[in-house]
Amino acid sequence: MQQTCIRLVKLDMLSTLTRFRTHSAIRCCAQRLFHCRPSLFISARTYFIKIDSSSLPKLKGSVSFSASCVSLGSSRLGLCSSSFKTGAPAALRAPVVFQRTRGFHTSGRRRALPALPLLWMVLKPLQKIMAIILGRSIRKWWVALPANKKQLFREWSWRRRWHFLGAGTGLLFIASLFFFTHLDESPITGRTRLLVFSRKNFRELAQFNADAFMEEFKDSLIASSDPRHKVVEQVVQILAQRNQDIAEISAVPWTVHVVDSPTMNAFVLPNGEIFVFTGMLNAVTDIHQLTFILGHEMAHALIGHAAEQASLSHVVELLSLVLLTAIWAVCPRDSLAALGHWIQGKLVQFLFDRPFSRKLEAEADQVGLQMAAKACADVRAGPVFWEQMEIFDQLSGQPTMPEWLSTHPSHQNRVRQLDRLIPEALELRARCNCPELPKTDPRVVFNEAVRLVLEGKKEQMLEKEEKNGKTQTGDMFP
């Protein structure tokens, strides 16, 4: 199969880097593939993407063939595992279900609602209201009781303390039984976790979310014939075909949607609906970073992080309802109860929800890096992406949020974690019969580029200060 190597080059917005080349000669081939526009990071960046020439529309501009492209084509799409055998037929015998973007219709298909997750979503806000009402009712009932009846109630409760203890023990036993019967093993990492809602139910629920997103983005969706859409689709196909050792990957019908928006975002719903924004395509440096990002997002869907996070949230919410009822029953005034309610919500958020979310993100980084390695991508580009995001945040003036306040790990922590995983990922990549990587490490190239920028800026500042000093001296001594 004839394949073309399309070089897409972006020029840096920083004038000090206009002469610095990171990968190849400055050139923009196949115009409008990525809308060659200024970038935020490195001066000259070349994208090497292999696309089947028969599937491309006729493009104006020059398309060059080069043997220097990193091969990610069908010749390397064999099944990759610890016992890898060369050749593509193994992958072809286990085809991946892959769907193109459907035409959007305002009247969606009618389907049965997934009962359990939807019921939980509807009842979740009502549970807190009922807990508040119950707590206030208990408080008002206790305040209205005469002193003698309060004393009788205390004596009655003390006489039946063993009944209460037995009831509490029974509830604890039921809760433990529920917990151990809902333990599940992560399909990729083998981690034991609590799973109240099944991944199947959440895939059904995700279809409603997908329809809502399609309605929201219907005016900005890029057609499947657009080269940017083809690039994302090609990367997803390679990731799916090269990771056939993951049983769940063939069970998900992957569907790609590219949204024309400057937002730097990409996400994958549990049912395999992939949404990538053009802002993310402009943010990545090369095809290797895009492979890592899509592998990270696909890992969320494959592991079932949405169902896992909702399960933990459900259990924490049930336990919080008991504490919430006690707060509104014990506090003498509604204002104090509202304050306690707010503190309780923040404690749950910062002690359970956000740390658990960061844990899932770190796991998706690990699995996504492994998937990218089996797809023959240069996994060393993964840490570079997060270093670029760190610089982007600094250049854009965005305030740096402490990690414990965020649902995601900090960029620096992600870089450190990926750097620890790179040697293992490179070994996995070598076992998958991938072509040898260039000796030049993109992490070294990026750090050198940053160093040159800083030195150039420092020299400019010194020259400016020296010039200002001479001007002031000339004014003082004409």
Swiss-Prot record:
Its EC number is 3.4.24.-. GO terms for molecular function: metal ion binding; metalloendopeptidase activity. Zn(2+) binds at residues 296, 300, 361. It is a single-pass membrane protein. Autocatalytically cleaved in response to mitochondrial depolarization both at the N-terminus and C-terminus to generate the short active form (S-OMA1). The S-OMA1 form is unstable. May form a redox-dependent disulfide bond. Exists in a semi-oxidized state and is activated by prolonged hypoxia. Gene3D superfamilies: Metalloproteases ('zincins'), catalytic domain. It is an enzyme of class 3 (hydrolase). The active site is at residue 297. Residues 134-164 are annotated as: Stress-sensor region. One of its GO terms (biological process) is energy homeostasis. Protease activity is activated upon autocatalytic cleavage in response to mitochondrial depolarization. The chain crosses the membrane at residues 163-183. Pfam families: Peptidase_M48. GO terms for cellular component: mitochondrial inner membrane; mitochondrial membrane. InterPro entries: Mito/Outer_Membr_Metalloprot, Peptidase_M48. Homooligomer. The stress-sensor region regulates proteolysis and activation. Belongs to the peptidase M48 family. PANTHER family: METALLOENDOPEPTIDASE OMA1, METALLOENDOPEPTIDASE OMA1, MITOCHONDRIAL. Metalloprotease that is part of the quality control system in the inner membrane of mitochondria. Activated in response to various mitochondrial stress, leading to the proteolytic cleavage of target proteins, such as opa1 and dele1. Involved in the fusion of the mitochondrial inner membranes by mediating cleavage of opa1 at S1 position, generating the soluble opa1 (S-opa1), which cooperates with the membrane form (L-opa1) to coordinate the fusion of mitochondrial inner membranes. This is Metalloendopeptidase OMA1, mitochondrial. It comes from Danio rerio. The lineage of its organism: Eukaryota, Metazoa, Chordata, Craniata, Vertebrata. The gene is oma1.
